[in-house]
């Protein structure tokens, strides 16, 4: 009988212990972003886009070619903007913020970072007007300076000055007008 009593007490402890009011622990991920959400902004622009065609002009060292495209992947077209996000925990202390009435600028002094500066322009109502992004890549093989400009419902421009080791400097510009 003592043997069964031990099992019954153990079973009751297990049943009542599992029914006890337990405090749940919630671990919240820090989703606050200290800088303008570049990636989220462009994901939203892509998702809400109703574009049916774009006019794309490519200029390389002064020569240009223009095409009207009705088949295009806006996600690929804007990928360089999507990849300019600075809201990563490892970058939180790498950028300084400068604000004026109509603009916010995020700038780094770290020459190793690809995104050197982001400047967002808004009108007096706080509506988004334009974003400028300066990217830099500097390796032993090449250097590249890119100036990106995006205007909602208007289009975007990518200007690049690139110098590859043992070759001439190459400038190119991509201008896309939304239609």
What are these regions (language model features)?
Residues 34-35, 73, 77, 171:
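Residue-level preference for alpha-helix termini and adjacent loops
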Residues 107-179:
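Extracytoplasmic electrostatic interaction patches
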Residues 27-49:
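Post-signal peptide N-terminal segment of mature Sec-exported envelope proteins
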Residues 20-23:
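Bacterial signal peptide processing site
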Residues 6-11:
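Sec-dependent N-terminal signal peptides
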